[in-house]
UniProtKB/Swiss-Prot annotation:
Listed GO biological process terms: L-histidine biosynthetic process
Record field: catalytic activity: 1-(5-phospho-beta-D-ribosyl)-ATP + diphosphate = 5-phospho-alpha-D-ribose 1-diphosphate + ATP
Gene3D superfamilies: Periplasmic binding protein-like II
Record has Disulfide bond as a keyword: no
Domain remark from Swiss-Prot or TrEMBL: Lacks the C-terminal regulatory region which is replaced by HisZ.
Protein's name according to its UniProt entry: ATP phosphoribosyltransferase
Quaternary state and interactors: Heteromultimer composed of HisG and HisZ subunits.
Cell compartments where the protein resides: Cytoplasm
Family classification: Belongs to the ATP phosphoribosyltransferase family. Short subfamily.
GO cellular component labels: cytoplasm
Function: Catalyzes the condensation of ATP and 5-phosphoribose 1-diphosphate to form N'-(5'-phosphoribosyl)-ATP (PR-ATP). Has a crucial role in the pathway because the rate of histidine biosynthesis seems to be controlled primarily by regulation of HisG enzymatic activity.
Presence of the UniProt keyword Nucleotide-binding in the record: yes
Organism: Prochlorococcus marinus subsp. pastoris (strain CCMP1986 / NIES-2087 / MED4)
GO molecular function: ATP binding; ATP phosphoribosyltransferase activity
Length: 215
């Protein structure tokens, strides 16, 4: 039986649509009152693990799941070994650098040397500023990073931005985009090497159907 790690939250519904097109129906995961963390497909050929987006690469890397769907932003932060197979082209949002509206910072190089930048994505933020040769202190936050500039703790933030509504409501604006993040299909490398046709059939079905998905 194929095991698939699906991300709970914003990516779940489209992830289920992707696998349904490939013949694996995990729609029971969308039942309003369900608290189950595992769901078997209707055809009984696969099961899904419902995990946090950030945990998908962990389950896939350690072999508890053969396949997974995860945001590109998570992959950029992770150092775990997974096979990166497909850009599924949904769940799109920008990883962005933002500052307070009333600041004088119009571009990254306007930020003062050694200023503080708040982010959940510390590896991504560090690599970005290193590439620009801008010395900054990255402050790791796990919650609402917008509070960094609001409270004066940080001059800027690096965070995911979808509609920009949260930034606007908190008096912040983007001054740069680091990259565009979408959902990605990943696999356990050993599963790819050892598995026979069933796993590869699922991957090929997803690859052939993703361009015609109306999601």
């Amino acid at each position: 039986m194929i095991t698939i790690a699906l991300p709970k939250g914003a990516l779940l519904e489209d992830s289920i649509s992707i696998f349904k097109k490939a013949g694996l129906n995990f729609s029971d995961a969308l039942l309003e009152n369900s608290r189950s963390l595992t769901v078997e497909s209707k055809c009984k050929r696969a099961k899904a693990l419902l995990v946090r987006n950030g945990d998908v690469p962990v389950y896939v890397s350690y072999g508890q799941a053969d396949l997974g769907i995860v945001g590109y932003d998570v992959l950029q932060e992770s150092e775990l070994k997974v096979a990166k197979l497909l850009d599924l082209e949904f769940g799109g949002c920008h990883m962005s650098l933002a500052v307070k509206n009333n600041s004088n910072y119009l571009k990254p190089t306007d930020l003062p040397a050694n200023c503080k930048v708040a982010s959940k994505f510390t590896k991504t933020a560090r690599a970005y500023f290193d590439d620009l040769n801008i010395p900054v202190e990255i402050v790791h936050l796990t919650g609402s990073v917008e509070l960094g500039p609001i409270t004066g703790m940080a001059e800027a933030i690096v965070d995911l931005v979808a509609t920009g509504k949260t930034l606007k409501e908190n008096g912040l604006s983007k001054i740069d985009d680091l990259f565009y993040s979408t959902a990605r299909l990943i696999a356990n490398p050993l599963s790819l090497r050892l598995d026979s046709n069933p796993l590869r059939d699922v991957i090929l079905s997803i690859e052939s159907s993703k361009d015609i998905l109306n999601i």
